């Protein structure tokens, strides 16, 4: 959750992590109090480190991202998971223009598993919906290996092309687009902090 002058700005509802150390498709839903309980060496610390890594990667400078994507201490070495991409997804609640929205943001990148491999972001998406019953998600970012698209106006589609480097996130590039109707959400995603006790 991000706090700003005593009011809640963004609250994490759920996180999904895959392809980080020994973690495979771990999804955690958060309540007001959430506890991770397991025997020693079952990956509790890896879950917390995976969340921290996912948020740190979003905020990292573009020149630091390739090093993060090449960190051999974080690449899965389990024989069933070796070479698996890192995937991070978070679901958050936030306010925009006095309305509550559910935001789904995620990305996936290929680790640099050997000297010949090139780390690259292979997928990224941002979807929002009003937190009312029966509402559907609206796609704001849609990226794959071939192209990156974003929604440039409230009435249009997610079809505007944007040029990004292979290790650059669209959500980082869109910080410079102040005229977007969802610019506040982009700024919040780029400045998230995660506190654990």
Residue positions per predicted region:
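N-terminal pre-Walker A segment at the start of P-loop NTPase domains
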Residues: 2-24
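Extracellular/lumenal ectodomain signal focusing on beta-strand-rich modules
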Residues: 14, 32, 50, 123-125, ...
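Phosphate-binding P-loop
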Residues: 25-31
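Hydrophobic anchor at the beta1->P-loop junction of P-loop NTPases
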Residues: 36
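The conserved Walker
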Residues: 40
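Conserved lysine of the Walker
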Residues: 44
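Conserved P-loop NTP-binding catalytic core
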Residues: 49-115
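Electropositive, glycine-dotted interaction segments
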Residues: 102-197
């Amino acid at each position: 959750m991000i706090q700003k002058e005593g009011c809640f700005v963004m609250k994490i509802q759920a996180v999904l992590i895959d392809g980080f150390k020994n973690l495979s498709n771990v999804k955690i839903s958060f309540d007001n109090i959430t506890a991770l309980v397991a025997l020693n060496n079952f990956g509790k610390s890896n879950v917390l480190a995976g969340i921290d890594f996912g948020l740190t990667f979003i905020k990292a400078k573009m020149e630091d991202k390739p090093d993060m994507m090449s960190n051999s201490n974080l690449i899965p070495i389990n024989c069933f998971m070796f070479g698996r991409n890192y995937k991070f997804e978070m679901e958050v609640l936030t306010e925009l223009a006095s309305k509550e929205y559910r935001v789904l943001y995620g990305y996936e990148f290929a680790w640099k598993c050997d000297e010949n491999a090139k780390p690259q972001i292979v997928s990224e998406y941002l979807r929002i919906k009003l937190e009312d019953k029966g509402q559907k998600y609206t796609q704001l970012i849609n990226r794959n290996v071939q192209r990156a698209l974003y929604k440039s106006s409230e009435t249009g589609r997610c079809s505007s092309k944007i040029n990004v480097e292979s290790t650059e996130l669209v959500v980082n590039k869109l910080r410079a687009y102040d005229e977007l109707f969802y610019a506040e959400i982009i700024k919040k995603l780029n400045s998230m902090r995660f506190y654990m006790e």
